[in-house]
Amino acid sequence: MKRLDQVLAADGVNAELELVIKDVMVACKDIAYKLGQGELAGILGATEDENVQGETQKMLDVISNDLLKDILVANPYVRGVGSEEEDYTIAGNADGKYLVTFDPLDGSSNIDVNLSVGTIFSVLEAQDDQSGDNQEVFLQNGRKQVAAGYVLYGPSSLLVMTTGNGVNLFTLDTNIGEFVLTKEALQIPEDTAEFAINMSNQRFWEPEMKQYIDDCLLGEEGPLAKRYNMRWVASMVAEVHRILIRGGIFMYPYDNRDPSKAGKLRLMYEGNPMSMIVEQAGGASSTGRMDIMDVAPQGIHDRVPVVLGSKNEVAKVVAYHTK
């Protein structure tokens, strides 16, 4: 089986970017180990702090964030890092070529009940000579990403990533401590009858999203003429992974609980990297009205509505929002 570094070399990834990705994996392997220890290591539960998003931080949120941040700012090729858990971007090497953004532990509300969580990351090229602690250097749309991926910590630890040449899946071989290639060129089925959404928020959605879900629930007799199944794990990494393997559509739409927020999920840490992965696997991603990766970020913590997965189903949701 091919190791990660062999696959990156075959894809023509340069040595600098390869080292950045490998450092992300060093941190993720450490996170996987700590998650496996769980209560034995005394690292479950919440802190008394909130992150910049206003969310109570789990202890493993903080630990995972520090592992990724510390190894990346020490990398000679990293200009700066941005994290969902940090108020501001952080400078790395002034001569670094790359910027890395990440959600250190997506779905962390699942930790204490031993359900799947994950790490999401995105790599951009620094476009000018500004320092990495200036967020302006990060404000590029998702089309500018040179790599994106996630690590799913489940029964096995899986890396799914793209450098713009398709999507590959790697499994962490704990015997050798390396991610090895186990599936190549993942492709999302174009059609689906499975959706993932948090139905408890339905009363807050826009009318277009309400109508789409209502039509899904009408089954074969409804306008969509399908019997749909619903899934919800409360972990974007787990939801997207299921879609990559068997198809489906994931939605976290705009809701009106806080009109000042464009959505729940963060563009730079979740929307863009997951959109790159999904589109590279033949799927589609949208806010409901435009492609997520075409959204111009105004701030490092911008939020965005998310609809992604099997491309024909995403097109149906977009049609509801644009007719």
From Swiss-Prot:
Q: Does the keyword Electron transport apply?
A: no
What does the entry's cofactor note say about binding and number?
Binds 2 magnesium ions per subunit.
- In which compartments does the protein localize? Cytoplasm
Q: Which UniProt keywords apply?
A: Carbohydrate metabolism, Cytoplasm, Hydrolase, Magnesium, Metal-binding
Cofactor(s) this protein requires = Mg(2+)
Positions of Mg(2+) 2 binding: 103, 106, 270
The record's EC number reads: 3.1.3.11
| Catalytic activities | beta-D-fructose 1,6-bisphosphate + H2O = beta-D-fructose 6-phosphate + phosphate
Which is a GO BP term held by this UniProt record?
fructose metabolic process
Q: Which Pfam families match?
A: FBPase (PF00316), FBPase_C (PF18913)
Q: What is its main location?
A: cytoplasm
Pathway(s) served: Carbohydrate biosynthesis; gluconeogenesis
Q: Which residues bind Mg(2+) 1?
A: 84, 103, 105
> In terms of domain of life, where is this protein from?
Bacteria
Q: Give the binding site residues for substrate.
A: 106-109, 198, 264
- Molecular function GO terms recorded: fructose 1,6-bisphosphate 1-phosphatase activity; magnesium ion binding
Q: What Gene Ontology cellular-component terms does the record carry?
A: cytosol
What family does the entry list?
Belongs to the FBPase class 1 family.
**Protein name stated in the entry:** Fructose-1,6-bisphosphatase class 1
In the UniProt record, the gene name given for this protein reads fbp
